Amino acid sequence: MEKIQDKKTGEVVFYKKHESGLNIYIMPRKGYTSYHAIFGTKYGSVDSEFVVPGEKEVTKVPDGIAHYLEHKMFDQPDGSNVFDKFSAYGGEANAFTSFNMTAYLFSCTGNFEKNLETLMDYVQSPYFTPESVKKEQGIIGQEIRMYDDNAGWRVFFNFLGLLYNNNPVKLDIAGTVDSIAEIDSELLYKCYNTFYNLSNMTLFVTGDFDAEKILEVVETNIKNNVPFTEEIKRIYPNEPKAVAGKFKEQTITVATPMFMMGWKDNDTGYSGRKLLKKSIEMEIITEMIFGKSSAIYNELYDEGLINQNFGFEYSPHIDYAYTAIEGESKDPKVVYEKITDYVDSLRKNGLDREDFERIKKVIWGDYIRSFNDIEGYSHSFLTMSMLDISYFDYFEEYEKITFEDISKRFEEQFDNNYSVLSVINPK
């Protein structure tokens, strides 16, 4: 195993690239009473068109199939329930599908090795029958209809639909009732055999244990030792720079109007340290201009235009990225106008160097504290590894960032020609 150490914090993670292609990260945490493991594949809702390694034909699958596959992974040939197995060992299991990743995870305070064996066993043991796949359509169809009436979900996907013309990130992760009706067991196996090949997967485990012993458990439970010899070719449509629309509103049962506004980032197409540096720069910038100490936050709050539910984030990915602001307001359009005017004034007058120095220290503090949240850290580590980023490279990239870098990045990112507003109004 390779020992990787964070030069600033001293935290250590052990890494091994298994002969199966599986990326294994083991992070011992002395004195911690809980354990966590997350087993993920670089496969999400946007991966609906691809070429399987060794094939020439393009495979196009229905929208929502990655999420559907995640649901079906819990089926067992003997009819048992995976969650019951975890419960028997005191483990709490879960899974999720995002745009770019599917992950299976558990937390426990004991029986870590038994829970880890259970995780590795079921994720490597697909069992799909035509009958069970058909049955799931009704369950997921109900879930889709439920999200159709979920204001938080709709304000978000309407926002993405305004930002993106063609990129599949604008499509609901679960698909539509019509698209999932096209899914059968044969398609599920094809997607599983393509994207759940261990060369496309990463396992991250953390807790108070001996790293060598845990590696032995992992290697003993690896079932498929045949990695792909070539990359999975993922096919995404070309995305123009322009946004698809500027404004969309929808009416749903909510107490107060909800909004999500933001800016499309057209600086995409790369991963690794370059993406990490941009992400840290955007963390600093968004906190500087929208955080609770910012002029615009206090103006909006004092005027009663926002409440405590105001939030913001920068979402970095290889093929798409955006900055989003969300909240509740009696007048979302006024909030949008005030924020975009504020951004224009900052573009004209420049950012504040003292704000930069202060917020940069705040962001570093957030990074240090992230190590205390085992589940959050595990999720972040896995997500970053799939973007070819090492969590432990954070400090080196953080140290490089200057006020000039921040100013340049702000100019690039906050062009109101690429801003949009999504609103949910009460019925």
Regions picked out by a protein language model, each given a short descriptive name:
Residues 1-81, 189-192, 196-299, 419-427:
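His/Glu-rich zincin catalytic helix
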Residues 76, 81-233, 272-277, 286, ...:
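Charge-rich, well-structured scaffold segments of protease-associated domains
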